[in-house]
């Protein structure tokens, strides 16, 4: 059973100082999809972000990278969803995930925010509706919750970055499977992916 995704969002903090930080993994994924489709993301002030449009499983798919700060991501997501009348279950949010190792990415439908400030704001701005898809991109955990903030706002060493990049490439390929064949097939492929060190 195919799934209609109409809005794909990559969470990030704006500005060059954050571009290569782990917290911006969601943006790396959306940029990868845009580059595969040969489109440039453009600033769109009314949606508080960088936007683009591709054809996806026969439907228009809007791409969005909020240029608000992470904890205000919901403002951009809600603005675009409201304008195009996109329901929460037609949205896929890509974000960095502390609870997965670098090189691992997983699709998921629904759930809480797990302490992720971007997800927290999106859930709130969508009227507490959590029923959207997520792509969780593993960045690993620093081992101490007091070090999380510095960790997500830091750059991964090149060995870890290579693993993250591989998982993002595979996730981009699996996104097409998600649209054409449904969540189960996309999950089966993505969740069995092994990044090469």
Swiss-Prot record:
Binding positions for tRNA? 18, 69, 71, 117
- Respond yes or no to whether keyword Cell membrane is given for this record: no
Where, subcellularly, is it found?
Cytoplasm
Q: Does the keyword Hydrolase apply?
A: yes
Active-site positions on this chain = 23 (proton acceptor)
Annotated site location: Stabilizes the basic form of H active site to accept a proton:
96
| Major localization listed first in the record, in broad terms | cytoplasm
Cite the record's note on assembly: Monomer.
| Family of this protein | Belongs to the PTH family.
Return the NCBIfam families for the record: pth (TIGR00447)
Q: What's the protein name?
A: Peptidyl-tRNA hydrolase
Tell me what gene encodes this: pth
